[in-house]
């Protein structure tokens, strides 16, 4: 495969991955009876950007790897631009605006990072602070939601999606930090367990009354089956000492970003 063809395929995969996240997020938004202009998966995209910033800041990567990772990260602008537009068309959604602007700002800082290491590191630290502000905006919106909405907006699920997305981004960009990439599946397993535990406690303490009809029971069954599927894929790759391929990561990402979708039906 020629270098030019490889670049086109990488660009296509990058656009496809963020488009899948955006498409499912917008589908969830369209299903809501009471429109809450808050991206369910926004904090996950911010987490993916933060992991990319960590690679830029601490990773010993060559200019070629840096350039490829910058190009892949630029596709995140699609997600944030769409959500900023949606938020601006609604009323009284300032925190979502802030979150979207923070996401776009991180894309800009990554794109324009200087070549001089000292200045570049300052640039990247500023971008990390902005991403942190975006996560804080998400947290502020989350704390204003009623307790009954926890299942749908549970932050562990989108954070899990963000780690998977970051892994996919690094693979698409052909990053060679194999030691760091090998740690990401472990983070996925931990987040998957935390998400399952949080949902189990929610059901135990607050949500049993929501699981009385067949539609809710079916949604919860699919939700937890998805956990087993993700865990099975990760454990199989771990036992066989396989690295997560692009195809495997796309499957994992699709399952993970659909987790909040099932909770809309509860």
Curated annotation (Swiss-Prot):
One of its GO terms (cellular component) is plasma membrane. It comes from the Bacteria. It is a multi-pass membrane protein. It is found in: Cell membrane. Keywords: Cell membrane, Membrane, Transmembrane, Transmembrane helix. The chain crosses the membrane at residues 9-29, 37-57, 69-89, 123-143, 153-173, 184-204, 216-236, 246-266. This is Uncharacterized protein HI_1241. It comes from Haemophilus influenzae (strain ATCC 51907 / DSM 11121 / KW20 / Rd). The lineage of its organism: Bacteria, Pseudomonadati, Pseudomonadota, Gammaproteobacteria, Pasteurellales.
């Amino acid at each position: 495969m020629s270098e030019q063809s490889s670049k086109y395929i990488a660009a296509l995969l990058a656009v496809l991955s963020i488009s899948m996240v955006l498409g499912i997020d917008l589908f969830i938004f369209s299903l809501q009876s009471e429109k809450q202009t808050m991206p369910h998966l926004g904090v996950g995209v911010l987490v993916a950007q933060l992991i990319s910033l960590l690679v830029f800041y601490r990773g010993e990567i060559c200019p070629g790897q840096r350039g490829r990772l910058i190009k892949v990260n630029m596709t995140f602008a699609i997600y944030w631009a769409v959500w900023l537009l949606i938020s601006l068309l609604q009323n009284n959604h300032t925190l979502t605006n802030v979150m979207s602007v923070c996401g776009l700002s991180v894309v800009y800082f990554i794109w324009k990072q200087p070549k001089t290491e000292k200045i570049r590191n300052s640039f990247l630290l500023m971008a990390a602070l902005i991403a942190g502000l975006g996560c804080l905006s998400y947290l502020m919106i989350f704390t204003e939601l009623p307790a009954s909405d926890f299942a749908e907006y549970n932050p562990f699920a989108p954070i899990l999606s963000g780690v998977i997305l970051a892994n996919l981004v690094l693979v698409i960009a052909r990053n060679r930090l194999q030691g760091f990439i090998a740690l990401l599946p472990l983070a996925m397993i931990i987040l998957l367990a935390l998400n399952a535990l949080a949902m189990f406690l929610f059901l135990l303490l607050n949500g049993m009354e929501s699981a009385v009809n067949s539609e809710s029971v079916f949604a919860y069954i699919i939700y937890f089956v998805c956990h087993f599927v993700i865990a099975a894929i990760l454990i199989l790759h771990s036992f066989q000492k396989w690295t997560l391929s692009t195809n495997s990561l796309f499957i994992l990402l699709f399952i993970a970003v659909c987790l909040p979708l099932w909770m809309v039906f509860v």
